[in-house]
Amino acid sequence: MFISRTTANDQGPVMRQASDVTPTWLSAVLGQPVARVSVQPGTGNWSQQATLQVELHDGTLQTLRLKLCLGQTFGRSEVDYYTRDYVGLAGAPLVRCFAAHFESGVGYHLLLEDLSATHHDRRDVLPTRDYGFSVAQALAAMHRHHWQTQPAPNEATLNRYLDEVRPGIAAFEAATGRAVQSRYAVHEQAFRQRWADARGMSLLHGDLNPTNVLTPKAADHPVYFLDRQPFEWSLTYGLAVYDLAYAMAPWWPEPIFRDHAQAILRHWYDSLNRPDYSWDQAQDDWRLSVAQCLDVPLEWCSKEDTLTKMRWLWEAQWTRIEAAIGSP
């Protein structure tokens, strides 16, 4: 089970640094007078993060997380994730959002509830079947909420996405000595053909890596999903089962994936409960989506700095995904 915690105000302009946060601004956002706030800088892969220790005038203490994504590469997808896309979904697996604002060409900020005292991400926790069921059930609810509500992505959208991946092919081949160009061409053709058909599509999270999933420190559920994929080139609508494939194939140890993937896929399918979408089609889409996960290490390889700096990650991802492709 999971608990809805979504509320948000569109509070602009976009914060440029954590020190811009003031008691006056927080008072307006929280709807309660704030006496003082202390800011503790944090880290993020593509963002600036900070923990805010907030003291209200009545002495109540509250901990919040500020996230700043600044620059022209960021779209408004993550702001919509908190302020629009799942507001009407009971039980949406999102942490509470108090404020969010996006400006084109500038970026966005988010002010989120901080659950670090009671919850942790899944980076250092071995996945289990029960955890997989929790993720699958939460994703099914989100996918059902926007099931087949849009046309399939157009060719320009797919091209923009693939243009981010393709430069990584030659770099991957040079770094590893493995030829993948012809294999990728076959996959791209299958990908384009299937993604031209809107069956089985929904809004996507796009980046359910283990650091973007929170659970209680002593349990595998409920789950909360953070940090929707924020880039302008990201695919925000497409084959729904890709979210589940990406949450597992690049990250799960191979024996655990092999033993539990089909049961978790079936739990997602049963929880989705869409009679217009057959189990056979879901399995076909799963296989294509697991193969699509190879785009992740290729995208790492597409940029010179991450080709080297993130080799420890993308090589491990490639190995796991290859094993997942070969799993029954």
Range-by-range predicted roles:
Residues 1-106, 216-223, 234, 328:
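Conserved NTP-binding catalytic cores of kinases and kinase-like/nucleotidyltransferase enzymes
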Residues 3-5, 144-194:
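Active-site catalytic-loop/activation-segment of kinase and kinase-like phosphoryl-transfer enzymes
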Residues 80, 237-274, 290-312:
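Active-site activation/catalytic loop segments of kinase-like enzymes and analogous catalytic loops
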Residues 99-134:
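Conserved structural core of kinase catalytic domains
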Residues 112-126, 144-147, 292-308:
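A glycine-centered beta->alpha junction motif in the catalytic cores
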Residues 121-155:
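Conserved kinase catalytic-core helix
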Residues 203-206, 210:
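Catalytic-loop of the protein kinase fold
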Residues 211-247:
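Catalytic activation segment of kinase domains across protein kinase-like and atypical kinase folds
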